[in-house]
């Protein structure tokens, strides 16, 4: 194949970067965002292209991804140099929102656009809350980035993929785990498969 050497190099670089916790070195507007810069740019491109009025994110951690989504949606509301706020929203779901992270997100200038739900993203009551919120929006995008086990991601896909609008996206993060050696993350419940 034409790009097989590049693919091998990319996979090798990604593993070496993860060995060094490279993804923990970045912030978005002051909040840590546990992502590779290339993924951040790709998300920005998807949001700008689709122009959603609701982004649903599973997994909050430090809140950097929520802030990225909210800031991009704020930019979508600038029309001809004037800020014309729409009813855009970012909903973040996490089973454990650490208090110091919650406080930091709540005092961030982008918080006005963010709702956080504490609970498992696959819990029926959480799913129902999100379905209700989604019913009030016309263009929905979904980012799945919480528990990376096969069963959990499959359950999230069943719950949230049907909410994705036509011509929008459901993005599953960290599928790179499939390219790493078995038990690469010994302190995590996910692995290859």
Locate predicted features.
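Mobile, glycine- and charge-enriched loop segments
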Residues: 1-41
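S-adenosylmethionine/decaboxylated-SAM
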Residues: 29-31, 38-193
């Amino acid at each position: 194949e034409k790009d097989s050497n590049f693919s091998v190099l990319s996979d090798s670089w990604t593993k070496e970067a993860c060995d060094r916790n490279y993804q923990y070195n970045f912030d978005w507007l002051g909040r840590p965002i546990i992502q590779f810069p290339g993924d951040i740019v790709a998300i920005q491109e998807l949001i700008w292209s689709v122009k959603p009025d609701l982004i649903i994110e599973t997994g909050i951690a430090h809140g950097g991804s929520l802030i990225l989504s909210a800031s991009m949606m704020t930019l979508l509301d600038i029309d001809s140099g004037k800020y014309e706020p729409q009813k855009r929203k970012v909903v973040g779901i996490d089973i454990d929102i650490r208090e110091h992270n919650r406080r930091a997100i709540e005092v961030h200038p982008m918080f006005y656009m963010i709702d956080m739900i504490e609970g498992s993203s696959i819990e029926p009551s959480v799913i129902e809350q999100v379905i209700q919120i989604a019913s009030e929006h016309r263009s929905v995008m979904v980012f799945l980035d919480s528990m990376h086990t096969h069963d959990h991601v499959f359950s999230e896909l069943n719950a949230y993929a049907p909410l994705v609008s036509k011509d929008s996206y459901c993005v599953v993060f960290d599928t790179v785990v499939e390219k790493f050696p078995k038990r690469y993350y010994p302190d995590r419940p996910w692995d290859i498969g």
